[in-house]
UniProtKB/Swiss-Prot annotation:
<keyword id="KW-0436">Ligase</keyword>
<dbReference type="InterPro" id="IPR008925">
    <property type="entry name" value="aa_tRNA-synth_I_cd-bd_sf"/>
</dbReference>
<dbReference type="GO" id="GO:0004818">
    <property type="term" value="F:glutamate-tRNA ligase activity"/>
</dbReference>
<feature type="binding site">
    <location>
        <position position="252"/>
    </location>
    <ligand>
        <name>ATP</name>
    </ligand>
</feature>
<keyword id="KW-0030">Aminoacyl-tRNA synthetase</keyword>
<keyword id="KW-0067">ATP-binding</keyword>
<dbReference type="InterPro" id="IPR020058">
    <property type="entry name" value="Glu/Gln-tRNA-synth_Ib_cat-dom"/>
</dbReference>
<dbReference type="InterPro" id="IPR014729">
    <property type="entry name" value="Rossmann-like_a/b/a_fold"/>
</dbReference>
<dbReference type="GO" id="GO:0005524">
    <property type="term" value="F:ATP binding"/>
</dbReference>
<comment type="similarity">
    <text>Belongs to the class-I aminoacyl-tRNA synthetase family. Glutamate--tRNA ligase type 1 subfamily.</text>
</comment>
<keyword id="KW-0963">Cytoplasm</keyword>
<dbReference type="GO" id="GO:0006424">
    <property type="term" value="P:glutamyl-tRNA aminoacylation"/>
</dbReference>
<dbReference type="InterPro" id="IPR049940">
    <property type="entry name" value="GluQ/Sye"/>
</dbReference>
<dbReference type="InterPro" id="IPR004527">
    <property type="entry name" value="Glu-tRNA-ligase_bac/mito"/>
</dbReference>
<dbReference type="Pfam" id="PF00749">
    <property type="entry name" value="tRNA-synt_1c"/>
</dbReference>
<protein>
    <recommendedName>
        <fullName>Glutamate--tRNA ligase 2</fullName>
        <ecNumber>6.1.1.17</ecNumber>
    </recommendedName>
</protein>
<feature type="short sequence motif" description="'HIGH' region">
    <location>
        <begin position="8"/>
        <end position="18"/>
    </location>
</feature>
Length: 457
């Protein structure tokens, strides 16, 4: 059975780039009747916050993602310690005592000599006495994973290709000799991303790892670690990344296009889903009405090689299309939460929906119709005409067709037509230059309110 995972770090509000990965995994699991695992990468105890864990759960629910299981890496430290000890005993995890400053100086020297800045495994040369001396100076070791890029002597590396058939990009190759042995454990004995991730993928029987192509190099290292643990390899698939229109990557620290902010601004969940999933693919970005329809057009192989640029203007356009197609029953509860209810609520929604881009913008038109207004939008030269229009307002209850009857009579009497006929009346009644059909607005306003607004001096 297909089993995928989404492993966010709860160190901030997740953004559109994060959620794209979540949606790719979720839709892939749905397409293959598999399972979707939510795994919080909360090994950074200081920066991980419960408020972000809660926010991620809310974001996923809003996007229609329902995890089959939830795990916390912070509750699995004993398991990571167990695996780390096995690797140490096998000589695959070795202690290093260089400081960050020493490593940086070494890197600069390598670059000045036009050499690749690869860690030289100097720590492997340390004797037991030298290690003891380092620790007596107060130095604590960080631990590196010994990459299998040598035959007998780890100080004599050779080209060692790790190959895999990527589910998105096809055959991929990483030369382990071109990489430094990765640090898996910091000086303070906390874990970096790699070891917990691989251990969890093994223990949780993850079959497919779908993520951004900035992880391709990591994959070479992780495959080596999977093999070191005698574990079965999952299928890897690397999709193109999302960037801003300026080509910058998204960041949780900058709160860039967080899902929370998009939701609070009033964007439709399905609009966010459609754009996040379809942008940067061979598929047209289409406003599918629900996730099931989006799933029918989802295919990992459709993603392009280049970075996809996410433009908020595209999201606004997509959102508009979707809102214009929403029926009253689709939004009834949300409108009620906006204090839009009553016997005219459905008629109101059908009248104004094609003139708004977000459901919450309906509040503006509800207030225009129901609240006391003091519009001053009519030009001075049109005010006499507005006053005159009262004499031609149809008798009785105003209906949709009343607008046509009214303006026809005014046109015949005054000679006005087009914009000079319609605009002053719209401005006097709504304070706006544009909006829903005036016939529908007349019915919503009612005769008494229409007369009151037209009578203002």
């Amino acid at each position: 059975m297909v089993k995928v995972r989404f492993a966010p770090s709860p160190t901030g509000y997740i953004h559109i780039g994060n959620i794209r990965s979540a949606l790719f995994n979720w839709l892939y699991a749905q397409a293959h009747k598999g399972e979707f695992i939510l795994r919080y990468d909360d090994t950074d105890v200081e920066r991980s916050k419960q408020e972000y864990i809660d926010a991620i759960a809310v974001d996923l629910e809003w996007l229609g993602i329902q995890p089959d299981a939830i795990y916390y890496q912070s509750k699995r430290f004993n398991r990571y310690d167990e695996v780390a000890e096995i690797l140490k005993q096998r000589g695959l995890l070795y202690p290093c005592y260089e400081t960050a400053e020493e490593l940086e100086r070494r890197r600069k020297i390598q670059l000045s000599r036009k050499l690749p800045p690869i860690y030289d495994r100097a720590a492997l040369k340390l004797t037991a006495e030298e290690k003891k001396n380092c620790e007596s100076q107060g130095r604590k070791p960080h631990w590196r994973f010994l990459l299998p890029n040598f035959e007998n002597d780890p100080l004599q590396t050779k080209r060692t290709e790790v190959c895999w058939n990527d589910a998105v990009k096809g055959k991929q190759t990483i030369d382990l000799a071109s990489l430094s042995d990765p640090v898996l454990i910091r000086e303070d004995e906390t874990y970096l991303y790699t070891l917990p991730s691989v251990v969890d993928d093994v223990d949780m029987a993850i079959t497919h790892i779908i993520r951004g192509d900035d992880h391709i190099t990591n994959t070479g290292v992780q495959i080596a670690l999977f093999k070191a643990l005698d574990a079965e390899l999952p299928v890897f698939g690397h999709t193109n990344l999302l960037a801003t229109v300026l080509g910058k990557g998204f960041s949780k620290r900058n709160n860039d296009l967080s899902i929370r902010s998009l939701r609070e601004e009033g964007f439709e969940s399905i609009a966010v889903q459609c754009l996040a999933v379809l942008i940067g693919t061979s598929q047209n970005v289409h406003p599918y009405p629900h996730q099931a329809a989006l799933l029918e057009h989802f295919n990992l192989q459709d993603t392009s090689k280049s970075v996809a640029k996410f433009d908020i203007a595209d999201l606004c356009t997509l959102n508009s299309h979707l809102v214009h197609e929403l029926n009253y029953e689709d939004v009834k509860t949300r409108l009620k939460n906006l204090s839009i209810e009553g016997e005219k609520a459905e008629y109101f929604w059908n009248a104004i929906r094609s003139n708004i881009d977000k459901v919450n913008e309906a509040v503006l038109w509800w207030k225009i119709i129901h609240d006391e207004q003091n519009f001053d939008a009519v030009a001075q030269e049109d005010r006499a005409f507005v006053q005159q229009s009262l004499n031609f307002l149809p008798e009785g209850v105003l209906k949709d067709e009343s607008w046509q009857v009214w303006t026809t009579a005014l046109k015949e009497k005054t000679g006005r037509k087009g914009k000079s006929l319609f605009m002053p009346l719209r401005q006097a009644l709504t304070g706006m230059d544009h909006g829903p059909e005036m016939g529908k607005l007349l019915q919503l306003l009612g005769r008494e309110k229409v007369i009151e607004r037209l009578s203002r001096k």
